Amino acid sequence: PTANVSVYASYSNSFTTNTGVDVNGNLLAASIIDQYEVGAKNTFLNGRLTANVAVYRITNSNLAQQAAYLADGTTPNTNSNIKTLSGETTSDGVEVGVNGTLSKNLYFITGYSYNNTRFTHSAGNKGSNIDGEKLVNAPTGTANASLFYVFSSAALKGFKVGASGFYTGSRFGGYNNTVGQAILGSRMVALTGFTTVDLSAGYTYHDISLQCKLSNLFNTLNYLVHDNYSITPIAPRALLVTASYRF
């Protein structure tokens, strides 16, 4: 580490209780989660530019998912409260962020994330997930970029405008495949990546703030959730206005 560079390493171990029951009506064991992470942060140009990078691995020893079959092993399960512990999942990822000030009034924020989440050490019995298969609804890459301008002239002091773009990469919808499944072929559905753009404007006067945002400017159509029982599209173009007062 130097005056402009900082590094860190961390490890955490935690558990998450799982709701629902297994196919025999028993409560589910907790999920044990281990996270390892190392990262670094650096500043350039006398603090006007900041860059950071982090590399991590997250393992979940007991991922709970809706059971594919009931206790007889042949009847499809349609009850989302009946679940199975699918075995271990592992997520390896990298996060990069670059933020900076271009002028007294203009600044930007950017970020990119890569994530590879897949099943590891599954049970191997009928209905269990397949080692190495990526989890559905887990994009490999996401990115964001925002540019903001803050007015400083006497006539416009307190006004701020901005534009932001958000990218969600390709991923799979549907359901993950299981050992011994009856359906032929794959149950996973390939979903394309998509980008949305937001515009924003705000005004602050003492303790009063007014914010206006036009989200999904180009009315992009894609899906947040896509499985056998529901298809949830991303929010369409919308105008959001909020007012707040700070006590």
PLM features: residue spans?
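C-terminal beta-signal and adjacent terminal beta-strands/loops
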Residues: T59, F166-I183, G202-F247
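Residues that define the transmembrane beta-barrel architecture of outer-membrane proteins
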Residues: I32-Y36, T90-D92, P139-A143, G193-V197, ...
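Gram-negative outer-membrane beta-barrel transporters
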Residues: T84-N176, T242-R246
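Repeated loop/turn-to-beta-strand initiation elements of outer-membrane beta-barrel proteins
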Residues: N4-V7, N46-A51, N105-F108, A154-F159, ...
